């Protein structure tokens, strides 16, 4: 989603 927290998920996207 948006770079607010830390990278999450296998793709390493920001949530």
Curated annotation (Swiss-Prot):
Catalytic activity as recorded in UniProt: Endohydrolysis of (1->4)-beta-D-glucosidic linkages in cellulose, lichenin and cereal beta-D-glucans
GO cellular component: a single term: extracellular region
Keyword Cell inner membrane belongs to the record: no
Function: Has endoglucanase activity on carboxymethylcellulose (CMC).
Species this chain originates from: Hypocrea rufa (Trichoderma viride)
Domain of life: Eukaryota
Catalytic activity, EC: 3.2.1.4
Cell compartment(s), UniProt: Secreted
GO BP, one annotated term: cellulose catabolic process
Gene Ontology terms, MF aspect: cellulase activity
pH effects: Optimum pH is 5.0.
Keywords annotated in UniProt: Carbohydrate metabolism, Cellulose degradation, Glycosidase, Hydrolase, Polysaccharide degradation, Secreted
Name assigned to this protein: Endoglucanase 1
Chief location of this protein within or outside the cell: secreted
